[in-house]
């Protein structure tokens, strides 16, 4: 116990010492941002020119929100993103499909008119179809048939993101709840319904979601942001729908309710990554507790080595204003300090008046926040928390990051097929960039999910291997990755470069770490 306390004290002292040396005149390297930026593409940004402008500002991942828009519209986003990628060859752009998810909604009001009600007003919430198009101030329809089975007296019901709140007084029968309104507001048509603190049995996917996922598979999207994930089995169901053709699509579980928070460990086991979706989560649980949930989920993802995205209202005021609030900038920086791999913009880039300015502001904020991270402390903590015995890939990842820190290396160059080795190196948060070289174009795109990874697609065909040709191919790829780093200015000539590779051709062989100088050739002729 005493030893543990001593270590904790040393760690805290080092962290405080690191922070005490920060100053506002620091200028981070603008050409190396570790945190990826996800941008929602909407009417204001759906063109090749706009997407290229967002890329120059810092975009890494294009997000399509399937709560809105037709297939024709989303197809145009995909086509524009792919064309933009071609115009900056070698720098992949990932495409994400964000599902609408299963939801509960009210019915239509009489005449589709808003119906005012006051705090204290008592009425019924009903699943009876006779009110589906005739809701009024006495009977409001909701389309969740099992609501009377899962909810109980004393529970809350929020309508329209909590603008209208009800307390359940009584479960009258299998179709009817007696409720009391808690605030003044309007009953309106087709508004979303939340049941905070109530476990619901909605399916993981609606029929629309299934159709949308098939559209995504057909168009070879790189990742799915799966809305309203409540349990680990939801992820398994999504994998079944994606099928063999969609096996490389990364599934990112959006945690948006108390059930998802309660079942987070089992979800984390199944998913490829997590999104802390703070909008709906802040409705389902008390807003001050979202801060705790964010810290917990990001920490568990970091320990597990799975990517985590922080999202919702990060620079919301920049939708209509050229500058963010100080609180918003602090929110972005805090997410980076917490350990988020990616941060996301929604309305700011989808419909905002200042999309490029928002991305630039987010990029600059991430760069400065990354300077404040005590990387040696983070590495030691993650290494101490790694389960023992570790597997080969994780051991090599730890060794590579340790070497990079001790050598003050300019970069870690990793050769990979699936991107898994790059993910594990990213887990241990090196200071230097991770230059990933892969012949797998899908892996180069979805590796934008991993903090610090700069993915490059290696276009040369894989040769028929013997030992000599294999080693030449390895050196060629390493040289190719180093040269790209030199051209982009993320490494400098003469830097020590930590290289991670297989020790021989084929799958399943132990990886090797070696150190080479950053030169234009590694003993190979051009």
UniProtKB/Swiss-Prot annotation:
The gene is pkiA. GO terms for biological process: glycolytic process. Disulfide bonds: none annotated. Keywords: Allosteric enzyme, ATP-binding, Glycolysis, Kinase, Magnesium, Metal-binding, Nucleotide-binding, Phosphoprotein, Potassium, Pyruvate, Transferase. Belongs to the pyruvate kinase family. Its cofactor is Mg(2+); K(+). It is an enzyme of class 2 (transferase). It comes from Emericella nidulans (strain FGSC A4 / ATCC 38163 / CBS 112.46 / NRRL 194 / M139). Homotetramer. This is Pyruvate kinase. One of its GO terms (molecular function) is magnesium ion binding. K(+) binds at residues 65, 67, 98-99.
């Amino acid at each position: 116990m005493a030893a543990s306390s001593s270590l904790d004290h040393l760690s805290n002292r080092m962290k405080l010492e690191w922070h005490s040396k920060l100053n506002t005149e620091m200028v981070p390297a603008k050409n190396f941002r570790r945190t990826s930026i996800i941008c929602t593409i909407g009417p204001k940004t759906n063109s090749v020119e706009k997407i290229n402008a967002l890329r120059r500002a810092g975009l890494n991942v294009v997000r399509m929100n399937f709560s809105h828009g037709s297939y024709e519209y989303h197809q145009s986003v995909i086509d524009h993103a792919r064309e933009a990628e071609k115009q900056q060859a070698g720098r992949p752009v990932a495409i994400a499909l964000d599902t609408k998810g299963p939801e509960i909604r009210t019915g239509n009001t009489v005449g589709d008119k808003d119906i005012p009600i006051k705090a204290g007003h008592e009425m019924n919430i009903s699943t009876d179809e006779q009110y589906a198009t005739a809701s009024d101030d006495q009977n409001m329809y909701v389309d969740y048939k099992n609501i009377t089975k899962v909810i109980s007296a004393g529970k809350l019901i929020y309508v329209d993101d909590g603008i209208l709140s009800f307390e359940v007084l009584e479960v009258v029968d299998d179709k009817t709840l007696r409720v009391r309104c808690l605030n003044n507001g309007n009953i309106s048509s087709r508004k979303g319904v939340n049941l905070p603190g109530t476990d619901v049995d909605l399916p993981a996917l609606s029929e629309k979601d299934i159709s949308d996922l098939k559209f995504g598979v057909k168009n070879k999207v790189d990742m799915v942001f799966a809305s309203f994930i409540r349990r680990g089995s939801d992820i398994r169901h999504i994998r079944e729908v994606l099928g063999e053709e969609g096996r490389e699509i990364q599934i990112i579980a959006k945690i948006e309710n108390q059930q998802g928070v309660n079942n987070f460990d089992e979800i984390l086991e199944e998913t490829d990554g997590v999104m802390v979706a703070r909008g709906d989560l802040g409705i389902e649980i008390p807003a001050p507790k979202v801060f705790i949930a964010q810290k917990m989920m990001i920490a568990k993802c970091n320990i597990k080595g799975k990517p985590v995205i922080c999202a919702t209202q990060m620079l919301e005021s920049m939708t209509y204003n050229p500058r963010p609030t100080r609180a918003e900038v602090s929110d972005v920086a805090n997410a980076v300090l917490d350990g988020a791999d990616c941060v996301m913009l929604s309305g700011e880039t989808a419909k905002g008046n200042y999309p490029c300015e928002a991305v630039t502001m987010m990029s600059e904020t991430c760069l400065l926040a990354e300077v404040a991270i005590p990387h040696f402390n983070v590495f030691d903590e993650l290494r101490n928390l790694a389960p023992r015995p570790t597997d080969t890939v994780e051991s090599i990842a730890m060794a590579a990051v340790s070497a990079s820190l001790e050598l003050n290396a300019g970069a870690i160059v990793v050769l990979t097929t699936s991107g898994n080795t790059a993910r594990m190196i990213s887990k241990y948060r090196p200071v230097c960039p991770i230059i990933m070289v892969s012949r797998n174009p899908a892996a180069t795109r979805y590796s934008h999910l991993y903090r610090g990874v700069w993915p490059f697609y290696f276009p040369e065909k894989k040769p028929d291997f013997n030992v000599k040709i294999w080693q030449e191919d390895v050196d060629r790829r390493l040289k190719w990755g180093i040269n790209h780093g030199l051209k982009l200015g993320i490494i400098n000539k003469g830097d020590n470069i930590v290289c991670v590779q297989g020790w021989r051709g084929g799958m399943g062989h132990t990886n090797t770490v070696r150190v080479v100088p950053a030169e234009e050739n590694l003993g190979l002729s051009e």
